[in-house]
């Protein structure tokens, strides 16, 4: 499907010269003089090479047809990450380039959305929140309940974050998968 360059957003998949590219960032630039342009940074899906393209905002580009489907995370090995479609039990392997910064938050059985082009996964969307255990932090200090200062902590997936003073080692907490920030104590 052909679209104008100014309508391209992060996460879109473009087809150019027979290859697929996932958009990492898209910015419309309107200089004081001259034609407005769209600056688009993309990663080639086949080999992970990053490129930067500049189009006039009115140029037509080819947007690939993408289908989003739910998959359950199974495991990770040297070849990549393995997911299974719950209804058909079809398994798909996803490269480390596609998973990217989401890797630490993947937990066995977690349901994620994979954006598929034919049979190739081009992007992954995690649930907004994940429940993890605090494995390392400073001891709980009595009387600091009114303080709004946070202390550093290491989670069970190895991610570092900041937690309130009342959270101790062994506490299960909910964090945002986008940036690893603390949301609340887990209710389980």
Swiss-Prot record:
Pathway(s) of this molecule: Protein biosynthesis; polypeptide chain elongation
Domain of life the protein comes from: Bacteria
Cellular component aspect of the GO annotation: cytoplasm
GO BP term, pick one: peptide biosynthetic process
Main localization (coarse): cytoplasm
Subcellular location: Cytoplasm
InterPro entries, per database record: Elong-fact-P_C (IPR015365), NA-bd_OB-fold (IPR012340), Rib_uL2_dom2 (IPR014722), Transl_elong_fac_P/YeiP (IPR020599), Transl_elong_KOW-like (IPR013185), Transl_elong_P/YeiP_cen (IPR001059), Transl_elong_P/YeiP_CS (IPR013852), Transl_elongation_fac_P (IPR011768)
Keywords: Cytoplasm, Elongation factor, Protein biosynthesis
Gene3D superfamilies: 2.30.30.30, Nucleic acid-binding proteins
SMART domains: EFP, Elong-fact-P_C
GO MF term set: translation elongation factor activity
Family affiliation: Belongs to the elongation factor P family.
PANTHER family: ELONGATION FACTOR P, TRANSLATION ELONGATION FACTOR KOW-LIKE DOMAIN-CONTAINING PROTEIN
Biological role: Involved in peptide bond synthesis. Stimulates efficient translation and peptide-bond synthesis on native or reconstituted 70S ribosomes in vitro. Probably functions indirectly by altering the affinity of the ribosome for aminoacyl-tRNA, thus increasing their reactivity as acceptors for peptidyl transferase.
HAMAP family cross-referenced by the UniProt entry: EF_P
Entry protein name: Elongation factor P
Species of provenance: Rhodopseudomonas palustris (strain HaA2)
């Amino acid at each position: 499907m052909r679209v104008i360059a100014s309508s391209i957003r992060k996460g879109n998949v473009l087809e150019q010269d027979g290859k697929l590219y996932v958009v990492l960032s898209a910015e419309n630039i309107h200089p004081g003089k001259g034609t407005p342009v769209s600056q688009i940074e993309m990663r080639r899906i086949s080999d992970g090479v990053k490129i930067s393209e500049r189009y006039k905002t009115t140029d037509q580009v080819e947007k690939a047809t993408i289908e989003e489907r739910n998959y359950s995370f199974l495991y990770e090995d040297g070849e990549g990450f393995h997911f299974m479609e719950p209804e058909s039990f079809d398994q798909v392997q996803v490269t480390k380039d596609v998973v990217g910064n989401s890797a630490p938050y993947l937990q066995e059985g977690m349901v994620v959305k994979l954006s598929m082009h034919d049979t190739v996964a081009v992007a992954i969307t995690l649930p907004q929140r994940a429940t993890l255990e605090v494995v390392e932090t400073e001891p709980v200090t009595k009387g600091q309940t009114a303080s709004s200062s946070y202390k550093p902590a290491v989670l069970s997936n190895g991610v570092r974050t900041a937690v309130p003073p009342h959270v101790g080692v062994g506490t299960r907490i909910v964090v945002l998968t986008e940036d690893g920030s603390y949301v609340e104590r887990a209710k389980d």
